[in-house]
Each structure stands twice: as structure tokens, then as C-alpha cells.
């Protein structure tokens, strides 16, 4: 009887302890809805501090014929965010911290008067009408509108992405406390000629939460240690030898690196640039004849790969690479710039793997890792055919089957007229990737004037960059979400030792990008269209050959159809969530 009593008391004690642990847990809820609904959770427990958040509706400005005219007045949008803290009744005190952000997902407005005359102003006030007048990176201004009224706020006329309003703000109470922040965005009507903003849109929401947001661009930049090349990242400032000089952060180098054990086999390079090279670690054979990785073999012919000193015939490039790693001849994952985009599935499907080219003006630029299939880009527009040759340098899902597209089958090398651009990339891709993911992509002003063969194809990267997108570039641009890589994106993705090479040297492969094939993570192994036209003609554009050099060919014709790897920039507000950046552990974003 005594034993039963003891057991009952013990069970009761365990239950009581469990309840104590549960109710002593700190409770808060992260609010990011921006939909005008309360998102707080209240837990009725004597020993709990409750910390909750609430946000108002999204902010929207859209100028149309009804509201955009002389005398119509300013256009405004208003919302709020609340942080609510209640202390437990045991200690009667509570202290917490929170962050408040304005996330601008769309802003197409521009300056119509001059850069000192703001068109959109941001005002932030607390519940007592006290205004915030200092924010890092923003300028607080006072202007007079068309009706003579004074309008104050931060100039956000062309701003996009994430704006930090409150950074780790402390909130303390001995009972309960609510901090409310009222936010207003105002389009200022000056009764001047502001026609440049007709039809423009602005969309944003407040985000209030306990955790600090790490922007993807900041995460990438944080991988740069100050030493060029650490983590395969290079800061292209004015002192980087042979660099772009545009203050971008770019990944460069090969995914695999030859080890001392690999060199001990007699290899001096991972893969060769032609079939006469005898010091490549991995060789490719087509129909029994030695060729080189990058050689295109008919699907009807036999093929295999050999590793130096190994007679095993490997059937795919990936098999040969994996075996080389297992033998200790290569190290892998040298460039950790993989991103999973278009899905939250785990593991990330090959079709959804993208790679970070770099950070440009606080925006992260991606390119698809594998060649896009017609299931993503469609069989309309500038689609040509499914191509069944075996590309020996491809690592994707199907090296023997690629969806091929013309750059512009209409025959001209004007990007704005290309159906690859208008239909396959900026209609089909955008629709097929899904609304949620498409909204994460920024509208980019692409430089599409291209350059001459001598300025881009037979020049070193630093010179080519200036003519393609730099100070000597054409003023021809095109605004769209999706594009293709620039030629110089490809050049600068190779190891710095390649930055003295040219895109193509007819007489010596050791002096062009064939020589750096194994040291360039952006080398895809197939045909790659770039977005840049050959401005020396009316019907040619630049592409990367399967052998890794850069050429210029016709944008149409049955024999000139190539693979496509879509490229785009993410909104600067895109947040880093997790991932090391390897293929098996790609970066996840929000």
C-alpha cells in the first residue's frame, strides 16, 4: 500500500514539474503578415512573459489617370506595427528586444525633377506622434508640395529592398507595455511635370520580429575575409589585379582542385584543353578515341572517362569526378555558391539548383546551374529542338539531352526583339517558377548593347568588361527580370590566373579560356548563350562553346541553337535562412 502511495506521489510530482517547465517557457510570435491582421498569441500562465507583435496592412502606391494629375494632391499609404510585452506576475518585470523593418518589394518610381527633390517620403512616428528623423543610409528632407503644404520624411524615391527602422530596440515593463509605430509613405505632387512617374508602383510591408534579419547579400559579403580568394570570393575593388574594378563581390575558381596526390600521378591539370594533352587527370574517350573533357560525342557512339593511372572506364563525368575525390586526387566544394531556388523541397532537386555569380549594388545575381529544359522555358518562342549529342563536360541531369534555343530566330541581334527574351525567359520562366518565387526576382536594367569581337571575344577580361558593361559600354539597355549571363560573368568566374587570357585565340589554346576550363565553376560543359550581341554585325551574339572558349555566331539558322541558363538578380531584401552553399547543402532564402 505504501509503495502504491509513493508511486502516486511521484507521478503527481512529475506532472507538476512538466507543467512548470511548460508554463515557464518564454512566449513570443514573429509577425510578418503585412495583411492588417493581428498575429499575436496570448498564453495565460502566471510565470510567463508574453511578447507579441502585430502589423497593419501592406503599403501600396499606384499612380493612374484618376489620382495623378495637377491639383489632385499627394498620394499616401499608412500602416502600423506594434510590439506588446506583458510581465509575469511573479517577478513583475520583463525586458525584451525587437527589430522593425520596411520591406519594399516593388518600387518603379524615379526622380522627375532632380535627385535632390524627393518624389516619395517615408515618415515614422510613435504613438505619441514623436517622429524618427535619423535612419542609417537615408536622408531626412522637408519639401513643399503643390498646394503649399510642408511634407517631411526620408527620401525613398528609388529605394527597394529592406530598410532597418529599429535595430535591436529594447522594450521594458513592470506590468504591460505596447509600443506602436505608425508609418506613412507619401508621393509628393508638386504640380510640376512629373510625367516620368505615370503608371509607377510602390509596394511595401512592415516586418516586426524578435530575430535580426540577415540579408543574403550581407551573408555573401561576410564570406570575404579581407584576403582575396578566401572562400573563393574576390572583392573587385580598384586594387584587385586584372579585376573589374566595380566593387562587386564575385565567386571565382573551380569546384574541384588538384591535390598533391593528384599531381603525383603526373597530372598538372584536372581536364585537358585538347586531345594532345598528356597531363590531364581525367581524359574523355569517344568511340574508342582519346579526346578531352568538353568534347561533344554523338549519342550513337560509345564513350567513357579514364583517370590517370586507373583503367576503370567511368560512364559519366560525375562518376569520374567522384572517383577522383575518393582516391584523394581532387578536393571538391571549393566554391560554395549554390542556392536552392523555386522550391523548399529537401534535398534540393537538381532542376532547382542555382549559383551565385556575385553581389552587385547590394543585389545577389544568380545563374541556373544546369541547362534549362523546355519544361521550364517552353517549346514556343525561340525554341529549336531537343538535342541528343553527349556533352562530356556536363555535370547536370542529362548531358545527352539538351533543350536548344535560338537567340532570336527572327534574325537580328537586338535583345528587345528576341522571343527567347520575351517569351521563353520573361514569360514562361517567370510563370513556371511560380508567383512566390518570381516576386523575389528584381527587375534589372540589362546592358544589351554588347561589343565588337575584338573588344570582347579577343580581349582580356578587364578590357572586355569595360566594353560590355563598364565605362565604354553601349547605352542600350533593357529592363526585365530574367536575362542571361554576360560574357564577363563567365570570364571572372575563372581563377585569377585566367584573367590574363582572352576569350578565344585561334592559334594557341593555352592563351584562351580553354586553358582554364577546369578552374571555372561557371563552365557548364555545353553551349551557353550570353545576353551580349556582337555589335560588329547585325545577326551575331556571343556564346560559350562546349570546349570553354568564347565565340560569336548567328542568332538564328538551324545550325546555331544553344543551351540556356537563365540569370537574374534577387531583390536586395532577400534574406539568408540557412545552408553552407555546397551542392548538398545549398543556401536557402526567404
Write out the residue ranges for each language-model feature:
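Well-ordered beta-strand positions in beta-sheet-rich domains
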Residues: 38-40, 82, 203-205, 304, ...
Amino acid at each position: 500500500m505504501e509503495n502504491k502511495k509513493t508511486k502516486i506521489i511521484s507521478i503527481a510530482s512529475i506532472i507538476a514539474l512538466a507543467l512548470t517547465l511548460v508554463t515557464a517557457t518564454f512566449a513570443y510570435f514573429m509577425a510578418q503578415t503585412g495583411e492588417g491582421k493581428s498575429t499575436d498569441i496570448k498564453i495565460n500562465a502566471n510565470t510567463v512573459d508574453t511578447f507579441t507583435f502585430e502589423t497593419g496592412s501592406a503599403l501600396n502606391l499606384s499612380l493612374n489617370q484618376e489620382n495623378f494629375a495637377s491639383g489632385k494632391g499627394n498620394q499616401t499609404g499608412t500602416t502600423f506595427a506594434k510590439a506588446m510585452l506583458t510581465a509575469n506576475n511573479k517577478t513583475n518585470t520583463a525586458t525584451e528586444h525587437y527589430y522593425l523593418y520596411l520591406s519594399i518589394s516593388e518600387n518603379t518610381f524615379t526622380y522627375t525633377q532632380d535627385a535632390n527633390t524627393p518624389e516619395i517620403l517615408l515618415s515614422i512616428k510613435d504613438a505619441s506622434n514623436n517622429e524618427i528623423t535619423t535612419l542609417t543610409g537615408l536622408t531626412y528632407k522637408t519639401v513643399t508640395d503643390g498646394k503649399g503644404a510642408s511634407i517631411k520624411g526620408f527620401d525613398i524615391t528609388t529605394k527597394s529592398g529592406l530598410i532597418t527602422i529599429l535595430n535591436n530596440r529594447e522594450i521594458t515593463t513592470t506590468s504591460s507595455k505596447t509600443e506602436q509605430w505608425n508609418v506613412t509613405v507619401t508621393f509628393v505632387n508638386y504640380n510640376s511635370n512629373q510625367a516620368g512617374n505615370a503608371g509607377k508602383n510602390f509596394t511595401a510591408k512592415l516586418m516586426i520580429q524578435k530575430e535580426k534579419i540577415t540579408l543574403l547579400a550581407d551573408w555573401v559579403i561576410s564570406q570575404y575575409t579581407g584576403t582575396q580568394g578566401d572562400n573563393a570570393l574576390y572583392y573587385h575593388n580598384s586594387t584587385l589585379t586584372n579585376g573589374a574594378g566595380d566593387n562587386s563581390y564575385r565567386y571565382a575558381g573551380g569546384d574541384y582542385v588538384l591535390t598533391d596526390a593528384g599531381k603525383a600521378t603526373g597530372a598538372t591539370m584536372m581536364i585537358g584543353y585538347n586531345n594532345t594533352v598528356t597531363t590531364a587527370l581525367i581524359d574523355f574517350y569517344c568511340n574508342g578515341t582519346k579526346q578531352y573533357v568538353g568534347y561533344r560525342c554523338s549519342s550513337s557512339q560509345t564513350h567513357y572517362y579514364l583517370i590517370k593511372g586507373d583503367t576503370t572506364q567511368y560512364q559519366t563525368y560525375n562518376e569520374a569526378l567522384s572517383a577522383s575525390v575518393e582516391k584523394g586526387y581532387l578536393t571538391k566544394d571549393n566554391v560554395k555558391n549554390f542556392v536552392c531556388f523555386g522550391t523548399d523541397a529537401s534535398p534540393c532537386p537538381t532542376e532547382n539548383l542555382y549559383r551565385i555569380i556575385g553581389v552587385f549594388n547590394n543585389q545577389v545575381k544568380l545563374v541556373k546551374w544546369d541547362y534549362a529544359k523546355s519544361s521550364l522555358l517552353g517549346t514556343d518562342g525561340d525554341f529549336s529542338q531537343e538535342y541528343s549529342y553527349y556533352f562530356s563536360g556536363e555535370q547536370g541531369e542529362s548531358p545527352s539531352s539538351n533543350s536548344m534555343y535560338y537567340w532570336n530566330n527572327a534574325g537580328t541581334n537586338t535583345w528587345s526583339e528576341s522571343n527567347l527574351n520575351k517569351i521563353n525567359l520573361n514569360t514562361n520562366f517567370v510563370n513556371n517558377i511560380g508567383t512566390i518565387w518570381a516576386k523575389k526576382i528584381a527587375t534589372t536594367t540589362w546592358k544589351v548593347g554588347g561589343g565588337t569581337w575584338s573588344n570582347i571575344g579577343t580581349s582580356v577580361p578587364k578590357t572586355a568588361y569595360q566594353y560590355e558593361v563598364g565605362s565604354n559600354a553601349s547605352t542600350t539597355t533593357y529592363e526585365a527580370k530574367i536575362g542571361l549571363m554576360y560574357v564577363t560573368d563567365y570570364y571572372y568566374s575563372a581563377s585569377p590566373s585566367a584573367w590574363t587570357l582572352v576569350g578565344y585565340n585561334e592559334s594557341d589554346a593555352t592563351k584562351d579560356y580553354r586553358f582554364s576550363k577546369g578552374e571555372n565553376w561557371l563552365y557548364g560543359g555545353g553551349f551557353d548563350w550570353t545576353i551580349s550581341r556582337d555589335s560588329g554585325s547585325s545577326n551575331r551574339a556571343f556564346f560559350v562553346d562546349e570546349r570553354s572558349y568564347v565565340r560569336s555566331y548567328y542568332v538564328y539558322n538551324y545550325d546555331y541553337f544553344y543551351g540556356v541558363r537563365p540569370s537574374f538578380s534577387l531583390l536586395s531584401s532577400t534574406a539568408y535562412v540557412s545552408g553552407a552553399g555546397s551542392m548538398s547543402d545549398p543556401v536557402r532564402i526567404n
